[in-house]
Amino acid sequence: MCTPFQENGKGIDIPRYQSHIDDLLGAGIHGLVLCSGTGEYAYLTDEEKHTLIQEGVKHINGRCPTIAQTTALSTNECIDKARAAEDAGASAIMVMPPFLEPPSERGVIYHYEAIAKAVRIPIVMYNVPQQAAPLTEDTYRKLIAIENLDYIKDSSGDLLNTQKFIQTGGRVFCGIDSLAPFALMSGCTGMIWGAVNFMPHECVNLFNLIDEKKY
């Protein structure tokens, strides 16, 4: 979801946020990601992130599953954010690997395993190799053997890479709008896309048609 701000730029516009949630649900979307990259996650304060998750989950009120992004530079900070999202009622969390100075594969696995032990809700791993430690097919196989780790959002922009993730048997979301029809026909569980914010009916219709194999 995108994040609506007040006209003066000082704070989130909660009424518009709630209205946008209602519009998306009215269009038939199957779930919402709160504090997404599209929602300017990297530029939000911790208080704004907490508000988006808390107010979002409260307003959605069980009408659809909610995924809350809790990415952070350090594992301990990420665990704190993950627990807060779980306490707020999020259905799942979405977490990028450590970024800025990416660790080795061993460090990436440690990061996700520590978070998985700290919460009970599912974790969506977030592959953005342009911005963080890349998640490879082999690393993903190791990660999905850990309880709570199954889903991955692939925003690599490489359809062949997405297909490799699918072949592991894990559940894969594609995060690149332009690949939507091809990713869904290849077997992706779903899309986490920005376009749904301004054309939700078309996005839902595309997903449903492909799900029904009406290519």
Language-model segments: residues:
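Active-site beta->alpha loop and helix N-cap motifs at the rims of alpha/beta catalytic domains
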Residues: T3-A132, K142
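Catalytic alpha/beta core domains of metabolic enzymes, predominantly
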Residues: A114-K117, P129-Y215
